[in-house]
């Protein structure tokens, strides 16, 4: 992958994943995000540290399978490919995913 400019770092984080399993992982300081398929762990680590001002200990990545979708009556297409990134933070850092109002 080409060198990433710091202004492009927020584009590497597509969204956070909120499911029952990922909420349980929050107790152990593991946060789950979606990223584009071509992003490396090093670039994603820089994006998380720059955007949330936290220290990342480790990152695990999973390539999600390609999903098929019907387009019209006979044709099939595919949905965009994503990578799931599980980020483990330092013990003193947190990311506030839920807004308290």
UniProtKB/Swiss-Prot annotation:
GO biological process annotation, one example: translation
Primary location: plastid
Single GO MF annotation: rRNA binding
Gene3D superfamilies for this protein: 3.30.70.330
Keyword vocabulary terms for this entry: Chloroplast, Plastid, Ribonucleoprotein, Ribosomal protein, RNA-binding, rRNA-binding
Gene Ontology cellular-component annotations: chloroplast; ribonucleoprotein complex; ribosome
Subcellular location: Plastid, Chloroplast
Role summary: Binds to 23S rRNA.
Similarity remark: Belongs to the universal ribosomal protein uL23 family.
Assembly mode: Part of the 50S ribosomal subunit.
Protein name listed in UniProt: Large ribosomal subunit protein uL23c
Source organism per UniProt: Cyanidium caldarium (Red alga)
UniProt gene name: rpl23
């Amino acid at each position: 992958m080409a060198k990433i400019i710091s202004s492009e770092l927020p584009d590497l984080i597509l969204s956070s994943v909120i499911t029952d399993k990922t909420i349980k992982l929050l107790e152990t300081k593991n946060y789950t995000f979606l990223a584009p398929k071509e992003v490396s762990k090093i670039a994603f680590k820089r994006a998380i540290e720059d955007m949330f001002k936290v220290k990342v200990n480790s990152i695990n990545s999973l390539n999600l399978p390609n999903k098929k979708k019907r387009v019209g009556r006979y044709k099939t297409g595919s949905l965009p490919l994503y990578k799931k990134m599980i980020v483990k933070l330092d013990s003193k850092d947190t990311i506030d995913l839920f807004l308290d109002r």
